[in-house]
Amino acid sequence: MKFENTIRMPVECRGVGLHSGAPVKLRIVPVAAGTGIVFRRVDLEGFTIEASIRNLAKVSYATSLMKQGVLISTTEHLLSAFVGIGVDNAIVELDNLELPILDGSAQPFVEMLLRVGLKQQRRRRTCLRILQPVEVREGDKFIAIYPADSYSVEYGINFPRPIGRS
């Protein structure tokens, strides 16, 4: 039986947005079980956007969220860090439209979160159970999900030179 987690105490960092180049202060705050991950634009009177598929914005260069015309961009590294270490509930405050890029990976976010530690909450974690394979294709691109006994992710991408397949 797995339970939801938040962080033990607030943590913050500063950086610049990858695409905007704008300075941004990011602060992550613990929150009650069942809240989920919620982004709060403190520069817009605390406007909130839940990290949910229904708020996913169609932006080709980053994982972005949008609600009522308000955008939060480049969320993928922080969201990956949350999933990777098991943070289910947090408020993410930022004072600009884009999260800081830091070193371009999830690692600085992981280190920042591990530094403050996790707090187990008294609510069981709910998980999506995949019962049959699902594939979505668009041209030569595809994504697939398959039933499994445990969480596992494989990812591949093929760029033109000089990067190639990774």
What would you call each of these model-derived segments?
Residues 1-166:
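Short acidic-hydrophobic catalytic motif
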